[in-house]
């Protein structure tokens, strides 16, 4: 009887890569079209949010349907924990922004002060986590030198 070892891929599945970068670009666009002061385009902001919601549901399903690369350890337990919490936070706040956005949309922009405030505060938290995520990617790429950024790009 032989036991086979299931290895983890070295990089993310191409569909996961497309979803990741599509969501990045759409989030940038959503921020550009946001604004309560009349400077934004709420219709376009809402449409983009709906597309991001659909892509995030697919992306989340992909995490279970397709093998993921092994966690990229820094060799430091504390930094690895921060990395895991950052990824959890990115998913949590992305979905909280989307869910509160859907609530606000379904109520015609009217409704709970809490939902609007949580939508805005989630954006703020998300910006901080995005900055941390980008900083960590550069840390891995240029200090740890583990080609982490190559995992979230297409094979050359």
Region annotations inferred by a language model:
Residues 1-156:
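Membrane-embedded alpha-helical bundles that constitute the cytochrome b-like, heme-associated redox core
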């Amino acid at each position: 009887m032989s036991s086979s070892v299931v290895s983890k891929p070295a990089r993310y599945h191409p569909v996961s890569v497309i979803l990741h970068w599509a969501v990045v670009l759409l989030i940038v666009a959503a921020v550009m079209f946001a604004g309560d002061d009349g400077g934004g385009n709420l219709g376009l902001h809402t449409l983009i949010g709906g597309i991001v919601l659909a892509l995030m549901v697919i992306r989340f399903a992909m995490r279970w349907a397709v093998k993921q690369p092994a966690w990229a350890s820094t060799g430091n337990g504390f930094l690895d924990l921060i990395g895991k919490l950052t990824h959890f936070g990115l998913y949590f706040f992305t979905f909280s922004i989307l869910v509160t956005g859907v609530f606000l949309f379904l109520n015609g922009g009217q409704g709970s002060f809490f939902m609007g405030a949580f939508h805005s505060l989630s954006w703020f938290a998300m910006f901080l986590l995005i900055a941390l995520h980008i900083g960590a990617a550069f840390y891995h790429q240029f200090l740890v030198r583990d080609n982490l950024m190559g995992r979230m790009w297409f094979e050359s």
